[in-house]
Amino acid sequence: MASFTLSSATPSQLCSSKNGMFAPSLALAKAGRVNVLISKERIRGMKLTCQATSIPADNVPDMQKRETLNLLLLGALSLPTGYMLLPYASFFVPPGGGAGTGGTIAKDALGNDVIAAEWLKTHAPGDRTLTQGLKGDPTYLVVESDKTLATFGINAVCTHLGCVVPFNAAENKFICPCHGSQYNNQGRVVRGPAPLSLALAHCDVDDGKVVFVPWTETDFRTGEAPWWSA
């Protein structure tokens, strides 16, 4: 005799027979805790009819959730970092124009233009929050201690293998969850295996909107030419 456990509310296919209703994946069903004994001979002799049940609506991501997921790791300061183990991928929202500056308008988690004044109302000094930057790269906006935006943005892509690096506010540095690389609060590498500091972008305000512009000058953190512009 074989013992199976049935679930009374499994959102999958349910099979019925003259002997009752049961889920085809009997060995995997656990919620119901109802033990039923069925002999191998009876199982072989059953005539089964399967009927698919619908997935509850609250299990299906709505459009806003799916669009938000298209922006990789935005708002990562307040979220767990486990999901950041995925390799870096570009945002799916097309980068915005830079109002004739040659740059890109920063986008928030919903794909909206970042308005500098509004951003500063909701982000405290020392805050580092991801936005969409140049070429769609995830880029940190930095709020200085005097509650102004820093003149630079920090590209969040790890220089080791391309994971998106979260900012650890408790330790005041960026720590990559993939292989442990660490960067100081300005993105300068302080521990490998990452070989280089995080890339920079100029952060300007044009017509009230935050604009990222390519950084081609000396890296102020290292005193060297910017490797990302080579």
From Swiss-Prot:
Keywords: 2Fe-2S, Chloroplast, Disulfide bond, Electron transport, Iron, Iron-sulfur, Membrane, Metal-binding, Plastid, Thylakoid, Transit peptide, Translocase, Transmembrane, Transmembrane helix, Transport
EC code: 7.1.1.6
Residue range covered by the transit peptide: 1-51
Keyword Cell division found: no
Listed GO MF terms: 2 iron, 2 sulfur cluster binding; electron transporter, transferring electrons within cytochrome b6/f complex of photosystem II activity; metal ion binding; oxidoreductase activity; plastoquinol--plastocyanin reductase activity
Subunit structure: The 4 large subunits of the cytochrome b6-f complex are cytochrome b6, subunit IV (17 kDa polypeptide, petD), cytochrome f and the Rieske protein, while the 4 small subunits are petG, petL, petM and petN. The complex functions as a dimer.
UniProt similarity note: Belongs to the Rieske iron-sulfur protein family.
Stated name of the protein: Cytochrome b6-f complex iron-sulfur subunit, chloroplastic
